[in-house]
């Protein structure tokens, strides 16, 4: 029986989830049964079909009366500001993918459960009162059947945490520092405009812009042993997609460049296949656009100083990679419930 998903908020991540589902060939196993979005339906259909970052969607999209169809699959379309009023029970929704970026607490997620959904998965970091924060491939084994409200973390935690885990397992990490070099986002203006963050009042295409980040806190949630041992800063750069992470860690044992790259390459072919990738080609950010991995190591940029300080450059498509992990985590949540029901 197919997994039934609903998407609340059809922005960058919501639309990429639908595209990723159909491009991955999983649309028979997973069905999007509903989308709730306050925007104009014609704009919803148009932006699903045509995307500046990811190109044209080659599955047919048609807008109907209160529906949007993809490859002939009808998806109910709602414009409901109150999630508690959505017909999730009638539609048999297994998991709501909460992609508005507005809701972040257990109280907010409860609105979807009240409407009849079985589970909720946030597409962004949530408050501490959720059942779990998951970075797929690292701690998804901590999911439990009784977990009804889960966060998928952020694109940056999904990018950096697998790398930290590999390095710690191989060499033992003492501490670390990270600079996120992030593509522009939709909270930045095209030309100077008002914003509560004075740096984000400035035109996105004209500056490298420092922004606040809670990445270090996100690492603590996934890997509690590192609480207080990582610091992070972030800047936004004038590109529209693909992010780079400048990761520096000090380790407990002497290492060299080859040992570091070999450890990462080995895990990319083993336990973290599909999550972690490795390249030694002379690539630039656009080359990682539409890459489904959570993180891609640029082996040409690995550096080791005084045998114990490692510096890495890690790439990710902050939209496409994360959208794929949303599908992975949603599948895992439903699979656990089905196993429990069989027992």
Swiss-Prot record:
Cytoplasm is among the record's keywords: yes
Record localization: Cytoplasm
InterPro entries for this protein: E4P_DH_bac, GlycerAld/Erythrose_P_DH, GlycerAld_3-P_DH_cat, GlycerAld_3-P_DH_NAD(P)-bd, Glyceraldehyde-3-P_DH_1, NAD(P)-bd_dom_sf
A single cellular component GO annotation: cytoplasm
Cysteines paired by S-S bonds: none
UniProt keyword list: Cytoplasm, NAD, Oxidoreductase, Pyridoxine biosynthesis
Range of residues in the leader sequence: none
UniProt superkingdom: Bacteria
GO molecular function: erythrose-4-phosphate dehydrogenase activity; NAD binding; NADP binding
EC identifiers of the protein: 1.2.1.72
Pathway assigned in UniProt: Cofactor biosynthesis; pyridoxine 5'-phosphate biosynthesis; pyridoxine 5'-phosphate from D-erythrose 4-phosphate: step 1/5
Catalytic reaction equation(s): D-erythrose 4-phosphate + NAD(+) + H2O = 4-phospho-D-erythronate + NADH + 2 H(+)
Active site feature: 155
Entry's family note: Belongs to the glyceraldehyde-3-phosphate dehydrogenase family. Epd subfamily.
Binding partners and assembly: Homotetramer.
Function: Catalyzes the NAD-dependent conversion of D-erythrose 4-phosphate to 4-phosphoerythronate.
Name the UniProt record assigns to this protein: D-erythrose-4-phosphate dehydrogenase
